[in-house]
Amino acid sequence: PAAQVAHIAHGTTVVTNLLLERRGARVVACATAGFTDLLELRRQERASLYDLTLHHPDPPVGHGDVVAVHERLVPGGVLQPLTPQECARVASAVLDREPDTVAITLLHAYENAAHESQLATAIAREAAARGLSVDVVCSHAVLPEMREYERSATTVAEAYARPAVRLYLGGLSTRLAQQGYPAPRVMTSSGGTLP
């Protein structure tokens, strides 16, 4: 009986399956101009350095769906400001590609989130003006750490999985609540749980 259940811990492979089966959301990414190839280039650390036949799977966002953003932060300051005109141009270019989610991964955002936040606001505003509902995922919120590739890859993975995970967990929570059970805590790969 539901009355005897105090906690529910739920483990799932939803995200792993989405990534392996390539069934995630349609993602458009925004990256600092000059760094739009970051996900394709990866870290350049290979176990078989001279194996020219080595193949990596394509990233969840294709090169044609990465929009260059003309801005540049440097440690300790702004080298090239992100203008309102550039925000409007990027927002339009992103939404013209009809994404489910948008991943914003600008250089040095772990240290200064201003440009990512400014761009996220512009995209949300333009989406609302077009009557669209689009999730915007910023790298400074997902993984506020140095190392551009890791931060970008993690942010894109979050954007790729978010809609399906939200739908799955929302449905699970609703069904449990309808039967009188408490909301589940979701187990993480790091060993903890999340509400």
Residue ranges and their predicted role:
Residues 1-195:
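N-terminally biased helix-coil "hinge/interface" segments that flank
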